[in-house]
């Protein structure tokens, strides 16, 4: 099969220097001009590298295709361990992107036509014989344009439960009712660096009329940038034909197909429906703080209590001055702070000295009560002496009590 080259769509030249990178638009590649190298049978697969005989340059170039704008309404980079992608455990299992071929989008339709032409060309009996010779019947071509498999839901009850779980997991993946959307599976350009795989697919973010290159070393970092509903453009490299060395489990023939890589992605980020932990931030606690301030007034109350204590100390100093004038009132004031019952006892002492003496004898069981009673007797008997020397009253009050005892 052959396909005419569209002369109106000339290849892109990045510069006029001796080294030029030629990029083609879809539907401009003539499959008959594809040059296929000999098989390299080293490694896990056979590989035959591809070049393109450019009719305008009369030289071999790489098969680099640039797409028009494609919106990621479907497919994209698979998620880890969700729904139909439950077998994906890490980034190593998803080093590719499914480029959707959404019906009605010019960029998708143009890309689909180009890859359908490639699939038709390389799956032909003539090409299979050219590649594998007498073993041609033992190989089956895997198309680049793929149709998602739809699981039959009319199975057992357990299958119904699994289907429900998958529906929940794939609810927000952009799937719509109607026929399944086809896609092209293209691998990211990954290289080995100190035992780790590093992405070399170029990411160019387009936003607000400005373009900037974004560094993304891992598939997770790519997925965080090229999200669902992003508007994307791709530079794709059809670089080789690969062929399996053995028959896969459940298959009857060995598989072969084209190798497709994504070399660059220009994208305008879409509105994300998921959560990105990097964008999470705590709100201010202004409202909560206002509620907390109310109970924190308790230390103010304690300060007020301290002030009251200071005031009481000042009052005590004033009372000491009053003691010099009238000591009996001071003793009644102290006894009133201890208990109301003692006030009544003191008043009775002032009214009746004999009853006071009886109460003193009753309270002699405790040392504190005996001392207070002796002080009261001394104050009643020696009023003049206490008024003359109020500051040394406590010491003189104790001495006569000891002499009497």
Curated annotation (Swiss-Prot):
Composition bias, Polar residues: 7-16
Disulfide bonds: none
Region (Disordered): 1-21, 150-179, 285-405
Stretches with biased composition (Basic residues): 365-374, 390-405
Biased composition (Acidic residues): 312-331, 349-358
Protein name stated in the entry: Uncharacterized protein R505
Species this chain originates from: Acanthamoeba polyphaga mimivirus (APMV)
């Amino acid at each position: 099969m052959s396909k005419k080259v569209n002369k109106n769509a000339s290849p892109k030249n990045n510069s006029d220097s001796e080294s030029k990178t030629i990029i083609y638009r879809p539907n401009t590649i003539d499959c008959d001009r594809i040059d296929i190298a000999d098989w390299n049978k080293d490694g896990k697969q056979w590989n035959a590298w591809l070049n393109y005989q450019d009719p305008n340059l009369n030289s071999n170039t790489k098969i680099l295709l640039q797409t028009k704008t494609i919106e990621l309404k479907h497919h994209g980079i698979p998620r880890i361990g969700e729904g139909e992608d439950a077998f994906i455990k890490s980034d190593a299992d998803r080093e590719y992107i499914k480029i959707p071929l959404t019906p009605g989008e010019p960029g998708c339709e143009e890309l689909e036509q180009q890859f359908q032409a490639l699939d038709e060309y390389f799956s032909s009996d003539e090409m299979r014989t050219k590649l594998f010779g007498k073993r041609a019947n033992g190989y089956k071509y895997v198309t680049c344009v793929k149709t998602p498999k739809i699981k039959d839901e009319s199975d057992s009850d357990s299958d119904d439960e699994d289907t429900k779980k998958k529906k929940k997991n794939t609810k927000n993946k952009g799937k719509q009712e109607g026929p399944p959307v086809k896609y092209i599976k293209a691998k990211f350009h990954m290289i080995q660096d100190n035992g780790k795989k590093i992405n070399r697919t170029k990411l160019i973010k387009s936003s607000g009329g400005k373009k900037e290159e974004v560094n993304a070393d891992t598939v997770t970092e790519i997925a965080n940038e090229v999200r669902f509903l992003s508007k994307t453009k791709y530079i794709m490299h059809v670089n080789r034909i690969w062929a399996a060395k053995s028959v896969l489990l459940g298959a009857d023939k060995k598989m072969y197909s084209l190798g497709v890589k994504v070399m660059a992605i220009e994208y305008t980020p879409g509105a994300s429906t998921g959560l990105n932990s990097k964008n999470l931030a705590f709100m201010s606690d202004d409202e909560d703080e206002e509620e907390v301030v109310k109970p924190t007034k308790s230390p103010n109350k304690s300060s007020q209590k301290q002030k009251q204590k200071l005031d009481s100390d000042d009052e005590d100093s004033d009372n000491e001055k009053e003691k010099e004038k009238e000591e009996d009132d001071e003793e009644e004031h102290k006894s009133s702070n201890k208990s109301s019952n003692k006030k009544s006892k003191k008043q009775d002492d002032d009214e009746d000295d004999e009853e006071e003496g009886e109460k003193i004898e009753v309270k002699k069981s405790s040392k504190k009560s005996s001392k207070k009673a002796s002080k009261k007797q001394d104050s009643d008997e020696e009023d003049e002496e206490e008024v003359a020397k109020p500051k040394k009253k406590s010491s003189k009050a104790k001495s006569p009590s000891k002499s009497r005892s």
